[in-house]
């Protein structure tokens, strides 16, 4: 673990997150916001650890604009801005919800306080379920529901999701014990809906899985580029749109996904179309507390 690089990635992610909050205004193209955020990451000396997620209202996660996307921010939209930065594979992951052109409300406060509650109980020796319990209690006592099938995650070098999850609810079997040096992203999601997300089209974010022989020439070209430029970190459909005509790109991605060479992350929507709020920080676990790298 390189604490210095983790801290630097966190510092960049924080700056970008705070700037994005100011940029998000009614009438702004979502595509323009995404491109501004990712450009800022590069200008500050980092690289995107994943495409910026800009998910509005009942969309909980995995929406990132595509070239030609005409989505415009409207006053009152609940916009979740989820930013990932890496330096040499050391990742910071942070998110905030803004209510476009309006003040924070109780739903947003519930997700934010759930994050604070989880951070306050986290330290070496604590079981993951205690964090889930803190998150669930904080959200439910305010009259909202945690999203049961979304969770925080362990982070390793060049690995955004490293196999251990921090759920948004108390689950008795979540007995992984936090260890000194562990890096985790904690990300409570609160909703006025049913508390569950489902996958819906489109798929705008993908990740390389493994090399697979494929017949389609464009698919072979694309897989080589994906592996070379993004490695094991997620990438956006948008980042590939200049590489080949739309029809060819869609076919190549479909071919690679079907072959198991890449994995697609469909957009996640609250099952009853309930508004969703999210807040997230990355932590490094210490003996008696944690370092929040993105604060």
UniProtKB/Swiss-Prot annotation:
Known cofactor(s): Co(2+); Zn(2+); Mn(2+); Fe(2+)
Disulfide bonds: none
GO cellular component, one term: cytoplasm
Cofactor: record remark: Binds 2 divalent metal cations per subunit. Has a high-affinity and a low affinity metal-binding site. The true nature of the physiological cofactor is under debate. The enzyme is active with cobalt, zinc, manganese or divalent iron ions. Most likely, methionine aminopeptidases function as mononuclear Fe(2+)-metalloproteases under physiological conditions, and the catalytically relevant metal-binding site has been assigned to the histidine-containing high-affinity site.
E.C. designation(s): 3.4.11.18
Functional note: Removes the N-terminal methionine from nascent proteins. The N-terminal methionine is often cleaved when the second residue in the primary sequence is small and uncharged (Met-Ala-, Cys, Gly, Pro, Ser, Thr, or Val).
Keyword set, alphabetical order: Aminopeptidase, Hydrolase, Metal-binding, Protease
MF-aspect GO terms: initiator methionyl aminopeptidase activity; metal ion binding; metalloaminopeptidase activity
Family from the record: Belongs to the peptidase M24A family. Methionine aminopeptidase archaeal type 2 subfamily.
Chain positions recorded as substrate binding sites: 62, 161
Keyword Metal-binding set for record: yes
Enzyme class: hydrolase
pH dependence remark: Optimum pH is 7-8.
Protein name per Swiss-Prot or TrEMBL: Methionine aminopeptidase
InterPro entries: Creatinase/aminopeptidase-like, Met_Aminopeptidase_Type2, MetAP_archaeal, Pept_M24, Pept_M24_MAP, Pept_M24A_MAP2, Pept_M24A_MAP2_BS, WH-like_DNA-bd_sf
PROSITE patterns hit by this protein: MAP_2 (PS01202)
Presence of keyword Metal-binding: yes
Originating species: Pyrococcus furiosus (strain ATCC 43587 / DSM 3638 / JCM 8422 / Vc1)
Annotated residues for binding of a divalent metal cation 2: 93, 153, 187, 280
Region forming the signal peptide: none
Swiss-Prot/TrEMBL GO biological process terms: proteolysis
SUPFAM superfamilies: Creatinase/aminopeptidase (SSF55920), Winged helix' DNA-binding domain (SSF46785)
Thermal characteristics: Optimum temperature is about 90 degrees Celsius.
Subunit structure: Monomer.
Effect of residue 173 to A: Reduces enzymatic activity by 96% at 37 degrees Celsius and by 88% at 87 degrees Celsius
A matching Pfam family: Peptidase_M24
Reactions that this protein is recorded to catalyse: Release of N-terminal amino acids, preferentially methionine, from peptides and arylamides
């Amino acid at each position: 673990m390189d604490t210095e690089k983790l801290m630097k990635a966190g510092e960049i992610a924080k700056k970008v997150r705070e700037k994005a909050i100011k940029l998000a205004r009614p009438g702004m193209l979502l595509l323009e916001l995404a491109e501004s955020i990712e450009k800022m990451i590069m200008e500050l000396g980092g690289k995107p650890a994943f495409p910026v997620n800009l998910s509005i209202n009942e969309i909980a996660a995995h929406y990132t604009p595509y070239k030609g996307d005409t989505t415009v921010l409207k006053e009152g939209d609940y916009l979740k801005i989820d930013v990932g930065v890496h330096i040499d594979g050391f990742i910071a992951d942070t998110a905030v919800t803004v209510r476009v052109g309006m003040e924070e409300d109780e739903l947003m406060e519930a997700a934010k306080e759930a994050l604070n509650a989880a951070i306050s109980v986290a330290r070496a020796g604590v079981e993951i379920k205690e964090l889930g319990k803190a998150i669930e209690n904080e959200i439910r006592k305010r009259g909202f529901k945690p999203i049961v099938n979304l969770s925080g995650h362990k982070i390793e070098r060049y690995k955004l999701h490293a196999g251990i999850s921090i759920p948004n609810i108390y689950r008795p079997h979540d007995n992984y014990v936090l260890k000194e040096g562990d890096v985790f992203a904690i990300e409570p999601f609160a909703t006025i809906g049913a508390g569950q997300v489902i996958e819906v089209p489109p798929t705008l974010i993908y990740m390389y899985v493994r090399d697979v022989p494929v017949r389609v020439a464009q698919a072979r070209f694309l897989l080589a580029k994906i592996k070379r430029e993004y490695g094991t970190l997620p990438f956006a459909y948008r980042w590939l749109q200049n590489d080949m005509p739309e029809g060819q790109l869609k076919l190549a991605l479909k071919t690679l996904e079907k072959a198991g060479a890449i994995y697609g992350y469909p957009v996640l929507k609250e099952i009853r179309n309930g508004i969703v709020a999210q807040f997230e920080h990355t932590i490094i676990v210490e003996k008696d507390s944690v370092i929040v790298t993105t604060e």
